Amino acid sequence: VTETMPIRLKVNGEAVSALVEPRQHLADFLRLHLQLTGTHVGCEHGVCGACTVRMNGDIVRGCLTLAVQADGAEIETIEGLSESGEIADIQAAFHRRNALQCGFCTPGMLVTTSELLACIDRVPTREEVRSYLSGNYCRCTGYQAIVDAIVEVAVARRSGSDT
């Protein structure tokens, strides 16, 4: 019998209390307990970026972070960022630029992109975008369309126009 531990956290603004196994990863907790399946689990080693979520405002890998480590934290998933409208322009640009194909990497790409655009006060260079996304793998697109979409959003945000 595995011992469980209580955790309390906020997920996408909602208070959550649960009993979790000490070794359960945050990504699995989000997917299995809360049915927030936009957080994908790919490599389970923190290198592919598919499990990227925000914890207390910083991006973390949900496959490396234990659910018990999120006790008391505020977690934002792709569902929360999408529902809030915070990433609507990024999602629209990804769609317009065909920056997604199978979609498996897309949630992690969008979460990482939202952090990039929030922490830089200018339009990033294409090389800076590629460097920032270096922890997010895509096996389908070749990254060109992803970088195009991100630069498009950065330019639009700087000019104050809608994308």
Model-assigned labels for residue ranges:
Residues V1-T163:
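Signature of N-terminal electron-transfer/Fe-S-associated modules in redox systems
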